[in-house]
Amino acid sequence: MYETKIKAIDLFCGAGGSSFGATKAGVDVVAGFDMWDLAIKTYKANFPKAEVFQTDLQKLTDEEIRQFKSSIGNIDLILASPECTNHSKAKGNAERDEESKMTAFEAVRFARVFRPRWMVIENVTEFESWDKFKDLLENLWELKYFVKKTIINAKNLGVPQSRERLFLLCSLTGKAAEPAAEYVITKPASTIIDNSGKYKFTPLRKPGRAENTIHSAERAISVLGNNTSFLLVYYGSGRKKNKGWQSIEEPLGTITTLDRFAYVTPSENGHVMRMLQPEELKLAMGFTPDFQLDSIPGLTRRDRIKLMGNGVCPPVMTKVVKSLVKNG
C-alpha cells in the first residue's frame, strides 16, 4: 500500500465527481482542469484548496504542459474523463465531432510530462469501439503503463443509479486491479426522492400534457395499480425498453445531460407529477449532501442537470482508486 499522501490532478474535471471520489479514498487532488466556466465555478466551490485552470487542453502546447508541471510539482495520479458525448449512443444519429473524441489523447500528453505512477481514464462504454482506441492503448503502452480495462456499473457499488462506464486503469508498476466484487444491496431510486413537499407538483392529466406522457403513465399504473408512485422516463435508450417508465424500487436509469425523469405519485385528487430536481440527481450520482450544487449562484437548473449528467459517480472512483493504489 502507498504510505505517503497521494497527489492527483483531474483533467476534464467537470463539477468534480472524480475528485470527490478520489478525495474519499485519501487522495489530495491538487488541481483541476476544464474549459466550461460553470464547471470551473462548481469545482472551485467544492475544492477550495485545489488550483483550478479554465483551459482547452487540446490547445495547450507541450511547453505549456511543462509549465503546469513546474507550477504544480510532482503528482502520483492523473484522473481523466475526456469528452464522451461524441462516443455515446445517447448522441443518437446526430453528427459526431471527431476532434472532440481526440481529447482522450490529452491524458497521454499530460502523462508524458507528469509521469504519474497511476492514471484512471473514464468514459462511456462505446469508447472502446472508437477507431482510435487501439492507438490510445498503444500510446499508454509506449509510456510503460500496464493498462487494465474494466466496465463498472455504478449500481453494483452502492450507487442508486444504473450507470455503466468504461475505466482504463493504468499503472507503471505492472499491476492494475479493478475493484473486487462485493455483495452490495442495490439502492433504489426511492432513496433519492425528496418527499418533504419542497418541490411543486402539477396534475398528471392537466390540459396540454403530452399524449406520450399520459400513455406511459397509464402503462405504469396498469402494472403497479393506482396507489404506487413511479418514474416516467423521457429520452434515452432505456425509454423504449421500459415503455417510458420505471419503478422507484429499482436504481434510477442513467442520468444524462437532459431532463429525463419525472416523479409521479398518487394524491387525493388523482396522480400528480414533477421532474426530478438537481439535488435529487446529485444523490443519485452518489454525491453526499454536503457537495455544493444548488447553493452555487449563477447556475440555472439546466446547468446543474448538465453538470450531473456529465459527471463521474464518486463512490465508483473511490473504489477504483483504492484498488489501483492497493495493488500498485
Task: Please place each PLM-identified region on the residue numbering.
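Class I SAM-dependent methyltransferase "Motif I" SAM/SAH-binding loop
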Residues: F12-A15, M308
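Conserved class I S-adenosyl-L-methionine
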Residues: I6-F12
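Conserved SAM/SAH-binding beta-strand->alpha-helix loop
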Residues: W36-D37
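Conserved SAM-binding loop of SAM-dependent methyltransferases across substrates and taxa
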Residues: A15-V27
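Class I S-adenosyl-L-methionine
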Residues: E63-L77, C84-T254, M273
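The conserved SAM/SAH-binding core of class I Rossmann-like methyltransferase domains
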Residues: G32-F33
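S-adenosyl-L-methionine
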Residues: K41-S70
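C-terminal target-recognition/interaction regions appended to catalytic cores
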Residues: H215-G328
